[in-house]
Amino acid sequence: MRLHVVDHPLVAHKLTTLRDQRTDSATFRRLADELVTLLAYEATRDVRTEQVDIHTPVSRTTGVKLSHPRPLVVPILRAGLGMLDGMVRLLPTAEVGFLGMVRNEETLQASTYATRMPDDLSGRQVYVLDPMLATGGTLVASIRELIKRGADDVTAVVLLAAPEGVELMERELAGTPVTVVTASVDERLNEQGYIVPGLGDAGDRMYGAAE
């Protein structure tokens, strides 16, 4: 597994505003969308392309286009939905799948409650969207499901990560073609499994379900 922390002043600026408890849901959604696009730029650095011949208004030349099969973008429900627009803004021709995961707040274990994606992901580059890499259980379970379906190149785009989650992924997904792209690796998890300093519950803050 490879970890890439994006170091950019705009990323740091938007992340700081997301962390602020005074930021309302509408602003939170907008900033999360903008931040995802910045992270997506780095996450797609190795997106597969193929050579193509074209004619400009002046002459013939050679360029590149995205290869087939098209990349697959998979937001993890529900908070991952708030990251979808920011990702497909850079990959408008990508296919979109959905993966519903829920975490037991007592055991912190993740389980699947819904899937909608191709059964065969052989040869596909897959981009998984989840705001928080906290304990790591949700992302590990999600990526295992994708690899089971044949995905051979998985990139997880997360706004924030905790060291504990990164360590779990490195241990559980050792030797797999997985990259994690994030704006920050924070200090730690608290006893409730939240990232510290973090930004709270990303889903609740996006959709206004809780303070």
Swiss-Prot record:
Catalytic reactions on record: UMP + diphosphate = 5-phospho-alpha-D-ribose 1-diphosphate + uracil
Organism annotation: Streptomyces coelicolor (strain ATCC BAA-471 / A3(2) / M145)
Gene name of the record: upp
Protein name as it appears in the record: Uracil phosphoribosyltransferase
Activity regulation (record text): Allosterically activated by GTP.
GO biological process, one term: UMP salvage
Cofactor mode of binding and number, as noted: Binds 1 Mg(2+) ion per subunit. The magnesium is bound as Mg-PRPP.
Cofactor(s), names only, from the UniProt record: Mg(2+)
Key word Transferase present: yes
MF-aspect GO terms: adenine phosphoribosyltransferase activity; GTP binding; magnesium ion binding; uracil phosphoribosyltransferase activity
Family listed: Belongs to the UPRTase family.
PANTHER family: ADENINE PHOSPHORIBOSYLTRANSFERASE, URACIL PHOSPHORIBOSYLTRANSFERASE, CHLOROPLASTIC
Pathway in which this enzyme or protein is active: Pyrimidine metabolism; UMP biosynthesis via salvage pathway; UMP from uracil: step 1/1
Keywords annotated in UniProt: Allosteric enzyme, Glycosyltransferase, GTP-binding, Magnesium, Nucleotide-binding, Transferase
Residue numbers binding uracil: I195, G200, D201, A202
EC number: 2.4.2.9
Residues engaged in binding 5-phospho-alpha-D-ribose 1-diphosphate: R78, R103, D130, P131, M132, L133, A134, T135, G136, G137, T138, D201
Class of the enzyme per the UniProt entry, highest EC level: transferase
HAMAP family, sorted: Upp_B (MF_01218_B)
Keyword Acetylation attached: no
